[in-house]
């Protein structure tokens, strides 16, 4: 069986690269002839904002580490599918149903395929796609109807989280079309990493805490943030640990740490920095999934989702971050860890410098590693079970 995976694999984003890698590795391990469809994303502006030294690392990974087809765009997708003679196309993972550009959305809902002569020859399945937004209500009715018709022709349907399923079911389908929730493939990543960790001799495994903050984090309220980092670093030093910053692709945060991982950072090396850390403190969804895959304690500085409540914002500013857990239903971090026993490993990231560094360290030190292990194992089990069912449907068994 030959499949093509249609996903976000080229952006300057570690998570986007690694979810494609994990999917590719998993299906290949099942004896499936697997390709990443080298689709050029119309809405991808990441190369315009990422640090120059980092761009090549993402592009090389997407084109050399992954098994990719020739580069295609909206006009050449059908020709590629014919040329490759795919039995099926997988859509996802990642936020491929984000409505940044309608033409990209059409690609990832696959209505272009179902409107072609290949609709009865090539099957389509969902592979943990996500929305990562608030609403589809502003999409034209004819576009919604096209997407509904396309989804109803998928051989297998799932979504990465409950929020995606909820919004698609309510605003696109009009009924409970998506019923399965399928974990992110990065849960499986650890078993597929076959490279050695590259690091200076001064940095030892499990003797540092890793932090990742937004670019130019200290530009606003810098005095308070620098004091917070200084206190955090001092407390870690007393415990015999270093503070290492791994910058996001856009650029470093501007904080003072013991070491900053230099660009260019290969996505697999990025994962290994998380795996070898004593704990991870930081932003980004796939950094948290990678922590779970690696068994690394984490504190998510959650900036996802949207909450309009002024009272909520005041509570967050005052340090009452648990309020966010009950209100911010669209946060993909909340959707990820709800029901895991790790809900306290997430706080509103906007005002993290208002949280005591001592409390953060104690929270990380007190995380039960067996809880992480059980949660990871359960997600891996669900992923494999869902994909086994998908393969049966594709094969018509």
In which residue ranges do the predicted regions lie?
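Active-site anion-handling motifs in enzyme catalytic cores
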Residues: 1-397
């Amino acid at each position: 069986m030959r499949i093509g995976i249609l996903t976000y694999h080229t952006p300057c984003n570690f998570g986007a690269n690694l979810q494609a890698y994990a999917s590719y590795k998993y299906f290949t391990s099942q004896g499936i002839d697997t390709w990443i469809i080298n689709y050029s994303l119309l809405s991808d502006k990441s190369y315009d904002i990422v640090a120059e030294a980092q761009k090549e690392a993402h592009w090389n990974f997407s084109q050399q580490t992954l098994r990719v087809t020739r580069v295609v765009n909206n006009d050449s997708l059908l020709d590629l599918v014919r040329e490759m003679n795919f039995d099926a196309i997988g859509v996802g993972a990642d936020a491929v149903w984000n409505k940044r550009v309608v033409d990209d959305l059409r690609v990832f809902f696959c209505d272009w395929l179902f409107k072609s002569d290949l609709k009865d020859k090539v099957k389509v399945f969902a592979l943990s796609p996500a929305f990562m937004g608030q609403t589809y209500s502003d999409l034209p009715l004819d576009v919604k109807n096209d997407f509904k018709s396309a989804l109803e022709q998928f051989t297998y349907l799932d979504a990465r989280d409950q929020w995606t399923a909820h919004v698609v079911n309510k605003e696109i389908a009009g009924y409970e079309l998506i019923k399965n929730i399928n974990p992110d493939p990065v849960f499986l990543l650890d078993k597929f990493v076959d490279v050695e960790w590259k690091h200076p001799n001064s940095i030892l495994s499990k003797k540092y805490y890793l932090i990742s903050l937004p670019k130019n984090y200290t530009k606003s309220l810098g005095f308070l943030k620098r004091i917070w980092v200084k206190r955090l670093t001092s407390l870690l030093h007393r415990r015999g640990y270093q503070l290492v910053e791994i910058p996001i692709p856009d650029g470093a945060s501007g904080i003072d740490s013991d070491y900053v991982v230099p660009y260019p950072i290969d996505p697999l090396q990025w994962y290994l920095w998380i795996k070898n850390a004593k704990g991870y403190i930081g932003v980004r969804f796939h950094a948290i999934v990678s922590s779970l895959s690696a068994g690394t304690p984490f504190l998510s500085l959650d900036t996802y989702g949207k909450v309009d409540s002024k009272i909520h914002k005041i509570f967050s500013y005052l340090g009452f971050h648990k309020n966010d857990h009950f209100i911010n239903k669209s946060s993909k971090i909340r959707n990820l860890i709800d029901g895991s026993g790790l809900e306290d490993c997430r706080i509103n990231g906007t005002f993290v410098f208002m949280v005591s560094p001592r409390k953060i360290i104690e929270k990380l030190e007190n995380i039960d590693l067996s809880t992480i292990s059980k949660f990871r194992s359960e997600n891996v089990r669900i992923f494999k079970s869902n994909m086994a069912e998908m393969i049966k449907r594709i094969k018509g068994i």
